[in-house]
Regions:
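Flexible, low-complexity linkers/stalks enriched in Thr/Pro that connect modular domains
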Residues: 1-4, 70-73
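Extended extracellular/luminal ectodomain segments enriched in beta-structured repeat modules
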Residues: 89-96, 133-137
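Serine/threonine-rich, repeat-prone extracellular segments and beta-strand-based repeat modules
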Residues: 16, 32-72
Length: 327
């Protein structure tokens, strides 16, 4: 009697990946004899692991079964105010990532129109390929844009200063804008030293709103600026973060006060109505008076895990974002 079941050949890979919201068409399978049936569905609107089963039955009733695994993965990560995770699917050793840091804050309804949107500095962008390991967990931190508040109103710190954007944005002083938070990926842990990709956040404007802060991003982020015409005061702006140190905070020569320096992952805090520094690999320095602005935070990519790197400065408006694509 015939006791050998059919042989099933899957078309394409036995493991497939599709982004949430993408499209999936089953490539199907073939059997060398008998009738082939397919069961299982893939919901591309919901992240998860799905199984498609192929069953073949020959004329004498012998059967064979094989399966295809389809991983529907979350590809777009927006600001959440906390760490998010991504688990590398089976068979994947490289992903493409597009990472955006957050911009500086803008006016809220509490004091609408205080600083025009034209004075909002923008966050940086990093595009790269990242080497990964199947099953590995990536920790994703998407930088926030602080919501501007009028002192005494909502969204204010207890000191009536502007709260820095989540993930490293420096605080604005008084009406000075806060710096934007950085967006990063961490591997092997959740500390600053575990970051393998960082897109820097923008520096905040001083309360006079005569200039925007330094743009985030780049190996060295944008410096802040100042306005010579504001009561003749040529006061200190913050410098952009680099690959080895935070940007220096501005110095107010008239009142002998210095704003906060940037540091690893953190923008400096503004003083005397100055703007905060942007978060980044190294954060930007803050500004020391209302007519000067904070520096942006720098971007970074790991020298051996990342390839085909493109850095762009001053791209993102609003909170950050991170997009993963599996080739």
């Amino acid at each position: 009697p015939d006791i050998t079941g059919p042989t099933i050949t899957i078309n394409g890979s036995t493991n497939m990946n599709v982004a949430v919201g993408g499209s999936f068409t089953d490539p199907g399978a073939t059997a060398d004899e008998g009738t082939l049936t397919t069961s299982g569905t893939v919901d591309v609107t919901t992240a998860g692991t799905y199984t498609i089963t192929y069953t073949a039955t020959d004329a004498t009733g012998n059967t064979a079964t094989t399966t295809r695994t389809v991983e529907v993965y979350q590809s777009v990560f927006n600001y959440a105010g906390s760490a998010q995770t991504f688990t590398v699917p089976v068979g994947v050793t490289s992903i493409s990532v597009d990472v955006y840091g957050a911009s500086s804050s803008v006016s809220s309804g509490n004091y609408a129109g205080y600083c025009a949107s034209g004075y909002q500095a923008k966050g940086g962008r990093v595009q790269t390929s990242l080497s990964v390991t199947p099953g590995q967990t990536l920790y994703i931190y998407v930088g926030g844009m602080s919501v501007y508040c009028y002192p005494g109103g909502n969204n204010c710190l207890s000191t009536n200063n502007q709260a820095g954007g989540w993930n490293g944005g420096g605080n604005g002083s008084g009406n000075g804008e806060a710096g934007g938070g950085a967006t990063d990926i961490r591997v092997g842990g959740t500390s600053m030293v575990d970051r393998v990709i960082v897109a820097g956040g923008a520096g905040g404007a001083g309360s006079s709103c005569t200039h925007g802060g330094g743009h985030g991003g780049g190996l060295t982020a944008g410096n802040g600026t100042y306005d010579n015409g504001w009561y003749g005061r040529n006061n200190g702006y913050g410098f952009g973060g680099s690959q080895s140190s935070g940007g220096n905070g501005g110095y107010n020569v008239h009142s002998n006060v210095s704003a906060g320096d940037g540091s690893l992952g953190q923008g400096g805090n503004g003083v005397q109505s100055g703007g905060g520094g942007g978060g980044g690999y190294y954060g930007g320095g803050a500004s020391a008076y209302q007519n000067s602005t904070g520096g942006g935070g720098s971007s970074y990519t790991h020298p051996t895990l990342c390839s085909s790197v493109v850095h762009s400065q001053g791209v993102q408006t609003g909170s950050g974002q991170l997009i993963i694509t599996i080739p």
